[in-house]
């Protein structure tokens, strides 16, 4: 009887432990997955400033290329894809928040014309779904800004080329949309940023000396990183500069350094880039009219040739008489 009670107690304990772990994982996962885009979403009403600069560049200081491909034109209420390319060397590893090395992640923000938005899942063709991967990774910048879509951070090895499933608006149902050429803006990054929105540095950037003087002591901290004591012999003051785990020191004890002189290397291997393109919302009636015009031109050419041959036959008959 005691063994049975003990077994029942053990089963309950295991089930409760597993349940707690699952709940903790669910709570923690969104904060990890959506940590980077949420910085911009919380701090800026619109990710594109009046100058054309995308706000992600405030945290990602290095410049890297990005590319975007879209159809030249689309019809109303049509699903199409925008292919965003964020190239980087897949062999390199970045400094993580804990100072260790890990894989590089990527992220992107796509600013579409008003009315354009993410395509509903049931409208996306099967072959496009295979290219997209997990549609849940895409999210609107704000509930009221469905034309601005963000994704990331996601693993760079799987998503250095991101396919956005989009749908065009219909001027027949949306009177604010017209058959025009529209701009599309892209911002894309690979790797972690160098500055947080509050202005503080991450551990993925260079650390500089706060004063000029002699490095009198370098203490390795228990949880990683360094405490660097710099003594200003002229003013007789001493300052301790803290370097978090991640960057590597390039100075040594006894060395005389200048103010703002780098104490560490630059661990950043990523960067941010902007791009833009254009897309035409095409009127189907215009295409139909164009086709009718081409058909009429071809028919006119055919009739002209037939008329010419008929005229030549009449001339030949008159000559034979």
UniProtKB/Swiss-Prot annotation:
Co-factor binding details: Binds 1 heme group covalently.
Region forming the signal peptide: 1-35
Cell inner membrane listed as a keyword: no
Cofactor names: heme
Sample GO molecular function, one term: electron transfer activity
Chain positions recorded as heme binding sites: 36, 56, 59-60
InterPro entries per record: Cyt-f_TM, Cyt_f, Cyt_f_lg_dom, Cyt_f_lg_dom_sf, Rudment_hybrid_motif
Listed GO biological process terms: photosynthesis
Protein topology in the membrane: Single-pass membrane protein
UniProt keyword list: Chloroplast, Electron transport, Heme, Iron, Membrane, Metal-binding, Photosynthesis, Plastid, Signal, Thylakoid, Transmembrane, Transmembrane helix, Transport
Main location as per UniProt: plastid
Record GO cellular component, one term: chloroplast thylakoid membrane
Transmembrane segment boundaries: 287-306
Compartments (UniProt record): Plastid, Chloroplast thylakoid membrane
Superkingdom field: Eukaryota
Function statement: Component of the cytochrome b6-f complex, which mediates electron transfer between photosystem II (PSII) and photosystem I (PSI), cyclic electron flow around PSI, and state transitions.
Subunit structure: The 4 large subunits of the cytochrome b6-f complex are cytochrome b6, subunit IV (17 kDa polypeptide, petD), cytochrome f and the Rieske protein, while the 4 small subunits are PetG, PetL, PetM and PetN. The complex functions as a dimer.
Family membership: Belongs to the cytochrome f family.
Name of this protein: Cytochrome f
Organism per entry: Psilotum nudum
């Amino acid at each position: 009887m005691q063994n049975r009670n003990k077994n029942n107690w053990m089963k309950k304990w295991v089930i409760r432990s597993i349940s707690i772990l699952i709940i903790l994982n669910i709570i923690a996962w969104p904060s990890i997955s959506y940590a980077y885009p949420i910085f911009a979403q919380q701090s800026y009403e619109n990710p594109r400033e009046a100058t054309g600069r995308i706000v992600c560049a405030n945290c990602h200081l290095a410049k890297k290329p990005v590319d975007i491909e879209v159809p030249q034109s689309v019809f109303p209420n049509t699903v199409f894809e925008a292919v965003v390319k964020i190239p980087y060397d897949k062999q390199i590893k970045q400094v993580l928040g804990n100072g260790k090395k890990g894989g590089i992640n990527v992220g992107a923000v796509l600013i579409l014309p008003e009315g354009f938005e993410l395509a509903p899942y049931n409208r996306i063709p099967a072959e496009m779904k295979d290219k997209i991967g997990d549609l849940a990774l895409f999210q609107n910048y704000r509930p009221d800004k469905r034309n601005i879509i963000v994704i990331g951070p996601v693993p760079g090895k799987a998503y250095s080329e991101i396919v956005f499933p989009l749908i065009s608006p219909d001027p027949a149902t949306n009177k604010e949309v017209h058959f025009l050429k529209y701009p599309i803006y892209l911002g894309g990054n690979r790797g972690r940023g160098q500055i947080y929105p509050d202005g503080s540095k991450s551990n993925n950037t260079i650390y500089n000396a706060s004063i000029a003087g002699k490095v009198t002591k370098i203490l390795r901290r228990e949880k990683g990183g360094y405490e660097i004591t710099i003594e200003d012999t002229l003013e007789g003051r001493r300052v301790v500069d803290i370097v978090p785990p991640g960057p590597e020191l390039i100075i040594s004890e006894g060395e005389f350094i200048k103010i703002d002189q780098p104490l560490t290397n630059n661990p950043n291997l990523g960067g941010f880039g902007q791009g833009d393109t254009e897309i035409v919302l095409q009127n189907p009636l215009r295409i139909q009219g164009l086709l009718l015009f081409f058909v009429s031109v071809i028919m006119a050419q055919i009739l002209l040739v037939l008329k010419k041959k008929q005229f030549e036959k009449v001339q030949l008959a008159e000559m034979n008489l």
